[in-house]
């Protein structure tokens, strides 16, 4: 079996460091908002070249509290994509706002900035571009529309830690960048975790208060907040991992290019596209293929841990029925959900494993075509 991700292999390379860091936290007696969280926030600010970061309980909370900090709520609209994980729109719903969907670019899987202006109404307050699979969005075009219409921008970077657009870190273009440290992420903890980044001190202070029950001073509460604090153990683990992230991302890129080489003569496999002047960090290596569901089943039977991210676009999910956005309204998103499949991708993946994955995928596609022709 070749899994989609193998966390155990990564742990084997840094396990002693992680265990030492965790034991130091346990011995310290400081488990919430202690020195590791503070140090990690500063290290992430340095890594991103932004003024502030705030550690949180999850990427979902990062999106939620970013919206709260910008006073977005009931009656407001937020433009985003339907081809993403539900947390993006979940956060919009939690604050009482309405998600408005625009379609994606067929090749990059990201928000198509040329379709933004048609979605703007007097109620539009923000845009949430999602840097899906580690691929940066076209931030120049998105920021130009946002500036023209005086809209906030919250970047969903949960799959794109370390990705670059024209040499600048994604997550530092808008009002906020939001990260997830879910264990499967490029920079993953060993539990839940998240973070916002911003260079606006007032926005930072608002999130600091919101994450801790709505108050900056203990037992003094200025508004309804939440309990969304990155705990010390996760912060300590992430501090061990952060110095490795550039090398891990480079390994992912190397694997992606090798996959591209292995698939170059197979017309049935459309490999990922990269925008010019971007640095994709390949959280997923996602291709488009014919007979996707049949091929996926065959791959699983043959021990290849391929996954479908995502099989149903958000506008067609039950949770968003109330929006009245029917089938056919986002044709590219809908088409891609029927064709995309993500192949094993993690830094420790070997070339031998990649060759096995590639040959198996090509064989499964050929077999599925033969079945369809009968």
Locate the predicted segments by residue:
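Conserved G/P- and acidic residue-centered "switch" motifs that form tight phosphate/ATP-binding loops
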Residues: 59, 96, 156, 185-186, ...
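PLP-dependent aminotransferase class I/II
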Residues: 8, 37-43, 47-51, 114, ...
């Amino acid at each position: 079996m070749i899994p989609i991700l193998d966390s155990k292999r990564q742990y084997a390379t840094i396990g002693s460091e992680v265990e030492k860091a965790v034991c130091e936290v346990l011995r310290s007696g400081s488990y919430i908002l202690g020195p590791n969280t503070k140090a990690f926030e500063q290290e992430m600010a340095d890594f991103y070249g932004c003024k502030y970061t705030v550690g949180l309980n999850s990427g979902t909370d990062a999106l939620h509290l970013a919206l709260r900090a910008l006073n977005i709520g009931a009656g407001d609209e937020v433009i985003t994509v339907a081809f993403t994980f539900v947390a993006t729109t979940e956060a919009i719903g939690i604050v009482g706002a309405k998600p408005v969907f625009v379609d994606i670019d067929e090749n990059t899987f990201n928000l198509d900035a040329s379709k933004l202006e048609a979605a703007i109404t007097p109620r539009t307050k923000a845009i949430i571009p999602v840097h899906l699979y580690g691929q940066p969005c076209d931030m120049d075009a998105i920021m130009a529309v946002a500036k023209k219409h005086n809209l906030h921008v919250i970047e969903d970077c949960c799959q794109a830690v370390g990705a670059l657009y024209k040499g600048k870190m994604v997550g530092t273009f808008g009002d906020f960048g939001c990260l997830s440290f879910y264990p499967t992420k490029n920079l993953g903890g060993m539990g839940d975790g998240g973070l916002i980044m911003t260079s606006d001190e007032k926005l930072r202070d608002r999130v600091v208060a919101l994450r801790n029950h709505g108050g900056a001073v203990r037992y003094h509460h200025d508004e309804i907040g939440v309990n969304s604090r990155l705990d010390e153990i996760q912060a300590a683990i992430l501090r061990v991992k952060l110095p490795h992230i550039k090398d891990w991302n480079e390994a992912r890129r190397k694997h992606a290019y090798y996959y591209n080489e292995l698939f170059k003569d197979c017309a049935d496999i459309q490999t990922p596209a990269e925008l010019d002047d971007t640095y994709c960090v390949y959280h997923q290596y996602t291709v488009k293929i014919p007979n996707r569901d049949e091929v996926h089943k065959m791959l699983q039977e043959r021990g290849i841990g391929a996954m479908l991210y995502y099989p149903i676009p958000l506008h067609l999910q039950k949770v968003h029925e109330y929006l009245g956005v029917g089938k056919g309204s986002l044709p590219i998103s809908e088409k891609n959900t029927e064709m995309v499949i993500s192949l094993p991708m993690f830094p420790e993946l070997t070339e031998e494993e990649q060759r096995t994955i590639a040959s198996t995928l090509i064989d499964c596609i050929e077999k599925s075509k033969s079945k369809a022709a009968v």
